[in-house]
């Protein structure tokens, strides 16, 4: 049966392309009907289970993505909902969210017929048909508001034009076609309405613990604020626990997003303020506001973190996060990241995080430990670097002193850098050998931060070493980027969530200050430009005067790779464990882990050059 849309004649149902037309497109585009219920490719079945994960792709809510993961088959099923479809849509993935060199699926029309294909874009944004069709269309169905596409793709295709889907951050890209194109090669992404969204596609499948009967909830929400019409806003709000709130365990939390703002609320975090301060000033405004009290910088203890696409976070049945009671600050800071690239005005928001807690304390308190680098300008990244690595250590000496013989069990991790961070990894080493990766994100983005459950719990014993490395890109910088708290300064942190809680709250390092001063003296000696090494000059001032030639860059890398470190092996009171922690040698690692090589799927048959497309049609079900 054939149906027509008078207002969208280009999407009228038509027969599949001829062999000649298919050959001209290198033979793998699939003709589909978009006006009626359209059928699947022969032998393909949509997944039986529902789609557990959903995200809006664009701020207007035109495109919505749902997905389902099969770890056994190593396949993802995608469902793309398109509202008010015009002349087509593209969807895909790229290394950092660029439209160039992207792995894509294309749905487009030439004004007569409609086509679906696996494609890719070159470095100029030109679209090309992929000779290896790894995205398989399963169904295209007309909906009340537009179109629903169901398709699947393996995690790994071993196609050089395809993106390898791993369990780190994925930069999804999308585009909307406003007019027909006579061929796929006539499309360039530069002329399209495009955007990006970040998400973790491959999430850990952890069994959901049952909730106790006495579970209660507490909502930490923004107080009906007006979302600024800026592309990026970090909003801070200080709230307080009820008076004399006793000790409880947080055992689960989930996001509460104001209806209609799903595409604007990017990620949220709840921090507990430092217990040492009896009072914190009230604040409700942008986190970078000049009116923000400096004391809010001491609200850094993460209680909950959510990012777009994340589901509810459950703690292991053995443990819960303590809050309330003696020794715990009643002050909490909510931070909401709004992503508003269209600069939409007049949108009110009361989004936040719902804490589920119980007065029946679990066997263990869950703790949060900071790994990585100390927040100090001693650690810096030269300008114009594409992949500069800084590494922080939690040494065997610290874990030997601070951990019990039974060790601790890390079950979740939140990686953190500021704006120039591109990769983060934490590795556990034992007896001089790297043993396992705690958490890794090779496509890390500072604009997408969440607490991620580990696929397998990592146990850390006394004498183990935890090594956290961050890779930075400062191509657009003219001065060195130093470590610190400011958003234009840098961090390298892994907040690991573990049980049972210990006194060790911070296990981080920085290069020894005396050896850094030797570096500045050496730069003075071999450079025609003078670097101030006088006592009154701050480290940032010294770094700002370094001439960044290749020699000075290489020497700074060597300094960080070999110089002694100052260890911060700190208790919850911010006091170091007793011992000598300055001028400590770097841990000696004799064997390192190699990144696993993706396994290529076994291909039973190759797609024919000019496929015959089986199409079945049904009347519109509405």
From Swiss-Prot:
Amino acids binding Cu(2+) A: 266-267, 337
Reproduce the UniProt comment on modification after translation.
Answer: Proteolytic cleavage after the membrane-anchor leads to the release of the soluble form. N-glycosylated.
* Reactions catalysed, as given in the entry: dopamine + 2 L-ascorbate + O2 = (R)-noradrenaline + 2 monodehydro-L-ascorbate radical + H2O
Cofactor descriptive note? Binds 2 copper ions per subunit.
Which tissues express it? Detected in adrenal gland secretory granules (at protein level). Detected in adrenal gland.
Q: Name one GO molecular function term.
A: L-ascorbic acid binding
Q: Which GO terms describe its biological process?
A: associative learning; behavioral response to ethanol; blood vessel remodeling; dopamine catabolic process; fear response; glucose homeostasis; homoiothermy; leukocyte mediated immunity
In this protein, the active site sits at 234, 416
Major localisation: membrane
- Compartments where located: Cytoplasmic vesicle, Secretory vesicle membrane; Cytoplasmic vesicle, Secretory vesicle, Chromaffin granule membrane
Q: Which CDD domains does the record match to this protein?
A: DOMON_DOH
**One cellular component (GO) term of this entry:** transport vesicle membrane
Q: Which residue positions carry a glycan here?
A: 68, 188, 476, 570
Its job: Catalyzes the hydroxylation of dopamine to noradrenaline (also known as norepinephrine), and is thus vital for regulation of these neurotransmitters.
Q: Which family does it belong to?
A: Belongs to the copper type II ascorbate-dependent monooxygenase family.
Q: Under which name does UniProt file this protein?
A: Dopamine beta-hydroxylase
Give the organism the record lists: Mus musculus
């Amino acid at each position: 049966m054939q149906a027509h849309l008078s207002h969208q004649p280009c999407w009228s149902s038509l027969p599949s392309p001829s062999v000649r037309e298919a050959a001209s497109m290198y033979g793998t585009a699939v003709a589909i009907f978009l006006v009626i219920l359209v059928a699947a490719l022969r032998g393909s079945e949509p997944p039986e289970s529902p789609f557990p994960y959903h995200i809006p792709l664009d701020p207007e809510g035109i495109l919505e993505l749902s997905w389902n993961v099969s770890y056994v088959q190593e396949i993802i099923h995608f469902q793309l909902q398109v509202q008010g479809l015009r002349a087509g849509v593209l969807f895909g993935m790229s290394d950092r969210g660029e439209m160039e060199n992207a792995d894509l699926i294309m749905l487009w029309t030439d004004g007569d017929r409609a086509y679906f294909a696996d494609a890719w874009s070159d470095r100029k944004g030109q679209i090309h048909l992929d000779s290896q069709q790894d995205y398989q269309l399963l169904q295209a169905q007309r909906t009340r508001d537009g179109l629903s596409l169901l398709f699947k793709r393996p995690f790994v295709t071993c196609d050089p034009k395809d993106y390898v889907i791993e369990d780190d951050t994925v930069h999804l890209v999308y585009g909307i076609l406003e007019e027909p194109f006579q061929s796929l090669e006539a499309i360039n992404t530069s002329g399209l309405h495009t955007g990006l969204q970040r998400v973790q596609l491959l999430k850990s499948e952890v069994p959901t613990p049952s909730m106790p009967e006495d579970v209660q909830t507490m909502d930490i929400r923004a107080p009906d604020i007006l979302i600024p019409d800026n592309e990026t806003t970090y909003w801070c709000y200080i709230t307080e626990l009820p008076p004399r709130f006793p000790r409880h365990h947080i055992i689960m939390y989930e996001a509460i997003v104001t209806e209609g703002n799903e595409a604007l609320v990017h990620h949220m975090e709840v921090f507990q303020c430092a217990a040492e301060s009896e009072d914190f000033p009230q604040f409700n405004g942008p986190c970078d506001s000049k009116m923000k009290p400096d004391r809010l910088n001491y609200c850094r203890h993460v209680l909950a973190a959510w990012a777009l696409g994340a589901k509810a976070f459950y703690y292991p049945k053995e443990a819960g996060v303590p809050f309330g009671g003696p020794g715990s600050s009643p002050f909490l800071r909510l931070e909401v990241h709004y992503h508003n690239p269209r600069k939409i005005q007049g949108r009110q928001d009361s989004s936040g995080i719902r804490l589920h807690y119980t007065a029946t304390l679990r066997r263990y308190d869950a703790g949060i430990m900071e790994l990585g680098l100390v927040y100090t300008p001693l650690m810096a990244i030269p300008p114009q670097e594409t992949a500069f690595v800084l590494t922080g250590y939690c040494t065997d000496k610290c874990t030997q002193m601070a951990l019990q013989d039974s060790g601790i069990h890390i079950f979740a991790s939140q990686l953190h850098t500021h704006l120039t961070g591109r990769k983060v990894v934490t590795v556990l080493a034992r007896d001089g050998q790297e043993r396992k990766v705690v958490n890794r994100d090779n496509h890390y983005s500072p604009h997408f931060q969440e607490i991620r459950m580990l696929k397998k719990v990592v146990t850390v014993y006394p004498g183990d070493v935890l090594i956290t490395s961050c890779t930075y890109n400062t191509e657009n910088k003219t001065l060195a980027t130093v470590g610190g708290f400011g958003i234009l300064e840098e961090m390298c942190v892994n907040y690991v969530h573990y049980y049972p809680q210990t006194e060790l709250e911070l296990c981080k390092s920085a290069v020894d200050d005396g050896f850094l001063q030797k570096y500045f003296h050496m730069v003075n000696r071999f450079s025609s430009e003078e670097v101030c090494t006088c006592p009154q000059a701050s480290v940032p001032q010294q770094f700002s005067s370094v001439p960044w030639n290749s020699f000075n860059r290489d020497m700074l890398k060597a300094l960080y790779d070999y110089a002694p470190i100052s260890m911060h092996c700190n208790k919850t009171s911010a006091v170091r464990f007793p011992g000598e922690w300055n001028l400590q040698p770097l841990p000696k690692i004799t064997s390192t882990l190699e990144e696993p090589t993706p396994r290529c799927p076994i291909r039973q048959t190759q797609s024919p050059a000019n496929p015959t497309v089986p199409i079945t049609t049904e009347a519109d079900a509405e």
